[in-house]
């Protein structure tokens, strides 16, 4: 919401009350409580007829400082509430002096001044990183609509850039944007978002989570150009400042607090193909797609059935359409015999035409209006109603239907929708409708996730989810929603993926080739390269199929090349996936996250790091022209082998079987020996590639098992012209390629052979000594 009108005025109809003077400071257990008045209250006569703000400072985890600013404490505070991991007895330090009161957790502290002018400062090791000054937080009375709000404005320094706030398709840097965290089904070409997360971070190395599930209004360097303002309709405002000091460290703390991304199964990193949305399909159509992929030597790993696996107008009652799929169990059995995993589409709604609608209504499993009638409308499905997942019996009914599908052979679910949740309703458990609007996405996906966890096991559970709220990163994978089939939407999708990664989500995908309309072949091929260098890769469309031969023969070559490349990269990719699970660092990440000390990376949103070591710059033009930036160092193309200097921009032109994919120096990269499947034994026949190891540096490569644990570690250390290579753990028949090295002066404990990319060394055991 807009509060100010320029620099000196406020918006018409608003009355503002600010904390201006500290009246008293108390320590209550592990909390620091500050009572602050909106005027000078040193005289007793001034202590009457005045509000008094209560500010509570606390720490749910080390390095996180919570702030709760309260006006009236008697207001209703119905749930839902974010599922936060709050630890007891976090070590804190409270200091109360004549000049200030300070609360400290880890290296982060909040300091409230006691002088004539109010200030709230957040400091890292005594150095201010942000805060709010006089009249920059408080209480807003809106006489236009008789509503009350709380707000805070945190300072932005010169050159400070803001990121996150969920999966947003606008410019990656949020500065200058107004953001309302209200989930909407708006596609990728608008300011609306499927996944609103009231959490942002900045390039100063801290993050802020606003702990309110309802709509939070952000003015990010917009209303006040040097401040992030956030406001919420409430009698209190609670937020957490999360210390870094690096972007990765911020996400480590944030996901430890809100939940780590689960580790998806290895097979989910392969290629997914769908029926598309409103296309005509039956078992014969499905078989023609799958057989066509096999005939063209196109690896395929997951097949997805979209909405029309069920009868029209009856979604979602979980019954296969008997006219289109008369033998679903037999069909699934036949598909799985071809080595495929099976995914089906679901949503949390039910059409009135469904035979089970009356049962659901009578049992009270559907969302109601305050007068007791069902909430219904005719959008999406005629007479559509919404499952009330605050009713445990409704959850059990829904879960039992899903378990029946799993028993039939379904491996995973595309959990679509969950954004357009109304507020003129009465939830079974009395939840606040304003808070449940966004949080519904969490309980919906949690329910489906738990079904898979209980049936196939957590190590095999995976979703393809559309909507999300805080904590939903625990239920991967998420995808970017409905995009157009053009380069602009391809770029929008990438911005959304980088944005959600900066909001705590480890795994992300998008509709390769675009969802709406049908892409020209050149767009499809460029998008395939981008999509198969994403954490998860799915071919999906709306009114047309996405099989590559529907475009041209070269599209088959592109899909084959990049699918095989991704399969070979799985030892590297799955280790990065395990790190996302352990630390919250997204697999696909903005350049500023990997290179926070390089200011040239702050605004980059057309390229990304795929893990710690590989830079990818998708091509957004038919001719193949692309510009990209490489940070400091010496970079090598993953398969072309050309080398480029960093700290500069580069301009190239690429064919459809290529794009800029550069590996940073001092990298030891593991490639597997299987280009047909993602799920294989990665520590057998592994080809390690050593890129530009500099004197005095060590490169380390950890090869994972399918549970994410490290099964083999290879290290290469260089001193002068000598490289010492040592392995630990279990590995068979591994080799080492010295990229762009054509010969060496000495080799101990191994043999050598030439290759186009560099000298290939085969060890006799698990150790080598190489003299350059």
Predicted regions, residues:
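Beta-sheet entry/capping signal
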Residues: 64-65, 109, 119, 198-199, ...
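Solvent-exposed beta-strand/loop surfaces of large extracellular or lumenal domains
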Residues: 77-93, 368, 638-656, 746-765
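A conserved hydrophobic secondary-structure block that centers on an alpha-helix together
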Residues: 189-190, 264, 275-325
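Short, well-ordered beta-strand segments enriched in hydrophobic/aromatic residues
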Residues: 34-36, 57, 69, 102-107, ...
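Aromatic- and carboxylate-enriched substrate-binding clefts and catalytic-loop regions
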Residues: 70-72, 81, 299-559, 594-598, ...
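Catalytic and substrate-binding clefts that recognize carbohydrates or anionic sugar/phosphate headgroups
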Residues: 2-4, 15, 47, 70-72, ...
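A low-complexity, Ser/Thr/Gly/Pro-enriched, surface-exposed linker/loop concept
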Residues: 2-43, 49-99, 140
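Catalytic core of carbohydrate-active enzymes
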Residues: 449-462, 468-479, 492-496, 500-510, ...
């Amino acid at each position: 919401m807009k509060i100010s009108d320029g620099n000196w005025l406020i918006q018409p109809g608003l009355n503002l009350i600010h904390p201006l003077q500290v009246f008293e400071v108390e320590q209550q257990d592990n909390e620091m409580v500050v009572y602050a008045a909106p005027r000078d209250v040193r005289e007793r006569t001034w202590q009457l007829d005045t509000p008094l703000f209560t500010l509570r400072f606390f720490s749910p985890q080390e390095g996180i400082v919570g702030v709760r600013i309260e006006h009236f404490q008697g207001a209703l505070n119905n749930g839902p509430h974010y599922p936060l991991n709050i630890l007891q007895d976090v070590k804190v330090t409270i200091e109360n002096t004549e000049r200030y009161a300070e609360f400290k957790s880890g290296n982060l502290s909040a300091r409230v001044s006691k002088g004539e002018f109010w200030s709230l400062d957040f400091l890292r090791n005594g150095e201010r990183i942000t805060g709010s000054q006089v009249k920059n937080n408080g209480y807003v009375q809106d006489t236009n609509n008789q509503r009350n709000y709380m707000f805070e404005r945190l300072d932005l320094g010169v050159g400070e850039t803001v990121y996150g706030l969920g999966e947003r398709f606008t410019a990656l840097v949020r500065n200058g944007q107004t953001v309302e965290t209200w989930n909407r089904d708006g596609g990728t070409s608008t300011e609306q978002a499927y996944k609103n997360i009231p959490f942002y971070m900045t390039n100063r190395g801290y993050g802020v989570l606003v702990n309110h599930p309802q709509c939070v209004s952000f003015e990010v360097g917009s209303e006040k150009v040097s401040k992030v303002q956030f406001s919420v309709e409430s009698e209190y405002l609670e937020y957490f400042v999360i210390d870094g000091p690096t972007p990765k460290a911020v996400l480590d703390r944030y996901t430890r607090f809100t939940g780590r991304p689960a580790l998806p199964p290895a097979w989910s990193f392969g290629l997914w193909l769908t029926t598309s949305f409103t296309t005509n399909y039956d078992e014969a159509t499905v078989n023609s797609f799958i057989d066509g992929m096999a005939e063209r030597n196109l690896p395929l790993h997951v097949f997805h059935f979209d909405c029309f696996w069920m009868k029209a107008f009856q979604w979602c009652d979980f019954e296969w359409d008997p006219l289109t799929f008369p033998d679903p169990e037999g069909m699934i059995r036949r598909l799985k015999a071809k080595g495929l995993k099976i995914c089906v589409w679901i949503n949390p709604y039910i059409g009135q035409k469904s035979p089970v609608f009356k049962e659901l209504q009578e049992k009270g499993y559907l969302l109601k209006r305050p007068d007791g009638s069902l909430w219904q409308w005719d959008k999406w499905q005629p007479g559509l109603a919404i499952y009330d997942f605050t009713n445990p019996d409704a959850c059990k009914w829904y879960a039992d239907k899903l378990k029946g599908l799993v028993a039939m052979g379904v491996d995973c679910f595309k959990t679509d929708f969950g954004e357009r949740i109304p507020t003129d309703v009465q939830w079974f458990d009395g939840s606040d409708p304003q808070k449940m609007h966004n949080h519904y996405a969490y309980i919906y996906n949690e329910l489906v996730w738990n079904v898979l966890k209980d049936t196939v096991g957590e190590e095999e559970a995976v979703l393809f989810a559309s909507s999300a709220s805080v904590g939903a990163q625990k239920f991967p994978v998420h995808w970017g929603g409905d995009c157009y089939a053009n380069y602009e939407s391809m770029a929008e999708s990438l911005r959304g993926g980088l944005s959600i990664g900066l909001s705590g989500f480890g795994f992300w995908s998008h509709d390769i080739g675009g969802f709406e309309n049908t892409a020209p072949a050149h767009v499809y091929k460029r998008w395939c390269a981008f999509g198969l260098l994403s954490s998860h890769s799915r071919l999906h469309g709306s009114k047309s199929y996405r099989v590559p031969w529907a475009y041209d023969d070269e599209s088959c070559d592109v899909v084959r090349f990049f699918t095989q490349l991704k399969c070979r990269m799985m030892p590297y990719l799955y280790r990065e996936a395990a790190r996302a699970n352990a630390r919250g660092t997204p697999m696909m990440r903005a350049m500023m996250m990997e290179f926070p000390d390089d200011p040239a990376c702050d605004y980059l949103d057309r390229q990304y790091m795929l893990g710690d070591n590989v830079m990818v710059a998708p091509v957004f033009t038919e001719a193949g022209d692309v510009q990209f930036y490489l940070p400091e160092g010496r970079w090598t193309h993953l398969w072309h082998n050309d080398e480029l200097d960093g700290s500069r921009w580069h301009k190239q032109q690429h064919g459809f079987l290529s794009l800029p994919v550069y590996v940073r120096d001092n990298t030891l990269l593991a490639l597997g020996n299987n280009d047909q499947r993602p799920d294989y034994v990665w520590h057998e026949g592994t080809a390690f590639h050593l890129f530009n190891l500099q004197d005095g540096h060590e490169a380390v490569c950890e090869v994972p098992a399918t549970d994410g644990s490290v099964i083999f570690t290879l290290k290469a250390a260089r001193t002068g012209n000598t490289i010492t290579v040592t392995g630990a753990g279990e590995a068979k028949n591994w080799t080492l390629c010295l990229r762009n090295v054509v010969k060496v002066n000495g080799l101990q404990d191994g043999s050598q052979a030439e290759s186009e990319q560099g000298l290939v060394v085969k060890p006799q055991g698990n150790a080598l000594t190489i003299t350059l």
